[in-house]
């Protein structure tokens, strides 16, 4: 399984639009093959920061997600409204028995 964790900080002015864009991206991504989980949350300690959590079946599914045109459009929109650079970390994971 592949886990993606990311975050983006924005301004109070841009937060509603960025949250709406993020939810649209999450809902669309959940329909993609290999997407096990995709969510966005508002950081409890910084309400202008959105935190993303994703689980993908494998690296191939994640790479396919990155090549969906709407994913590129989303990242471009996020970058335009971000304060600083968005953060994204990708991990290979397996369950602990």
Annotate the PLM regions.
Residues 26-51:
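Short, glycine- and small/hydrophobic-rich beta-strand elements in well-ordered beta-sheets
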Residues 28-36, 55-89:
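An amphipathic, aromatic/His-enriched active-site/gating alpha helix that lines ligand/cofactor pockets
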Residues 9-18:
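Short, surface-exposed ligand-recognition loops at beta-strand->loop->(often short) alpha-helix junctions
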Residues 2-8:
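Active-site-flanking beta-strand signature of metal-NTP-handling nucleotidyl enzymes
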Residues 2, 40-46, 74-97:
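Glycine-rich beta-strand-turn "strand-cap" elements at beta-sheet edges
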Residues 12, 44-46, 56-60:
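Feature marks short, surface-exposed loop/turn motifs that line or immediately flank catalytic pockets
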Residues 1-2, 19, 56-58:
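N-proximal accessory regions
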